Design a protein with these regions (language model features):
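General small-molecule cofactor/ligand-binding pocket signal
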Residues: 109, 179, 263
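A conditional alpha-helix N-cap/helix-loop micro-motif detector
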Residues: 108-109, 133, 160, 182-186, ...
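Soluble or luminal CAZymes and related metallo-dependent hydrolases
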Residues: 16, 51, 108, 184, ...
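Catalytic core of membrane glycerolipid acyltransferases/transacylases, capturing the structured
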Residues: 73, 80-83, 87-92, 122-183, ...
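Short, contiguous strand/loop micro-motifs
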Residues: 8, 42-43, 103, 127, ...
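Non-catalytic C-terminal accessory region of glycerolipid acyltransferases
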Residues: 69, 120-121, 145-146, 169, ...
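Short hydrophobic/aromatic residue motifs in ordered secondary structure
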Residues: 32, 135, 302-303
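Membrane-anchoring hydrophobic helices of lipid-metabolizing enzymes
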Residues: 1-130, 168, 173
């Protein structure tokens, strides 16, 4: 018998690994997992030199850019960076809460110019552009429980199919569809267009450049310096010819509840092949501007632990 393809073997192993973590959390509880988290986070903080440097770079940039509005009283050091890592771990636990369907102990309040209830009234769906700032899973879980519109989440990591299968095993009522993609092609666009025409919504992040084509990016100022942003989500928005919204969900450090920012971006994004990047600037300016503002107010919820400005590669 011929050996299995490596992707098949890896996919099978990843399913059981994901299922084990979800089951352990489901029965072990939040606080037990939190006890395990502290040494794990400390280990990754001590051994992850590049991630630690990226954290310190970001926190210091926020402090310098914000000036008198800085969330820090002095330049952030290694203690602030460790706390940054710690918050990443805590948010990961709350993501699992959302995935397995546990009743949250927090509330989600709307702070944007649009509410999910307004989206329910529209005949068609739309594109929700988020980021790795905050916790989109909480927003997805809230929307899934309170509203009928289906959320299709595009992810650029491996094993989305395994995750979908494991999630259904733990929480059969889960109605979040993770769609694993390596590239945005016409076949994907056609499938998503059909779903949007049926009233569903597509969630995609816009702050990281393409895994397969990092050169397909567009630059915009962010925290005082030019940074590369993904081009794919905006091209997809143009192809889908649908309403576009920005979606951010961040934990308020004062009361532990979540602030949901759902903001209308445009009714339809038109990007001609000629001068595409110039035509994109108005909506990208709005997106980067809101991302920047929220990053200053919620700096510990910035979960891009890499050189976001690509300074090390210059």
């Amino acid at each position: 018998m011929a050996d299995k393809h490596w992707a098949q073997t890896d996919e099978r192993g990843s399913y059981w690994g994901i299922l084990f973590v979800l089951r352990a959390y489901q029965y072990g509880g939040h606080w037990l997992m939190r006890l395990v988290l502290a040494p794990v986070i400390t280990y990754f903080f001590l051994t992850g030199k590049a991630s630690r440097r990226a954290s310190q770079q970001f926190l210091r940039r926020v402090h310098e850019f914000a000036g008198g509005e800085s969330p820090f009283t002095q330049p952030p050091g290694w203690r602030k960076s460790w706390y940054h890592f710690w918050q990443f771990g805590l948010h990961a636990l709350e993501k699992i809460d959302a995935w397995v369907g546990k009743s949250p102990k927090y509330t989600v309040r709307n702070c944007g110019d649009t509410q999910f209830s307004e989206l329910e009234k529209r005949p068609e769906g739309g594109l929700l552009v988020g980021s790795h700032l905050g916790n989109l899973e909480v927003a997805r879980a809230m929307a899934g429980k309170k509203y009928s519109r289906r959320l299709n989440v595009l992810v650029f990591t491996q094993h989305a199919q395994s995750f979908n299968k494991a999630l259904k095993a733990v929480n059969p009522k889960a109605d979040i569809d993770l769609i694993q993609v390596t590239d945005i092609d016409m076949g994907l666009a056609i499938m998503l267009k059909e779903r949007i025409d049926n009233g569903e919504y597509v969630v995609i992040v816009g702050d990281r450049t393409s895994v397969t084509a990092p050169q397909q990016s567009v630059s915009h100022e962010f925290l005082g310096e030019s940074a590369p942003f993904a081009l794919g989500p905006w091209i997809l928005a143009s192809v889908l010819e649908c309403p576009v919204y920005f979606l951010f969900c961040l934990k308020n450090p004062e009361d532990g509840n979540y602030d949901l920012y759902l903001n209308f971006a445009c009714e339809q994004l038109k990007l001609p092949r000629k001068n595409r990047q110039e035509a994109l600037q108005p909506v990208l300016k709005k997106y980067a501007g809101q991302l920047e503002q929220l990053a200053i107010h919620y700096p510990y919820q910035w979960f891009n632990f890499f050189d976001f400005w690509h300074k090390d590669s210059q």
